[in-house]
Amino acid sequence: VAIRIIWSDIQD
């Protein structure tokens, strides 16, 4: 699961 990776990409 890469929810944190995706979320981080969106937050940036």
From Swiss-Prot:
Expressed by the venom gland. One of its GO terms (cellular component) is extracellular region. It is found in: Secreted. Disulfide bonds: none annotated. It comes from Brotheas amazonicus (Scorpion). This is Venom peptide 7. The lineage of its organism: Eukaryota, Metazoa, Ecdysozoa, Arthropoda, Chelicerata. Keywords: Secreted. It comes from the Eukaryota.
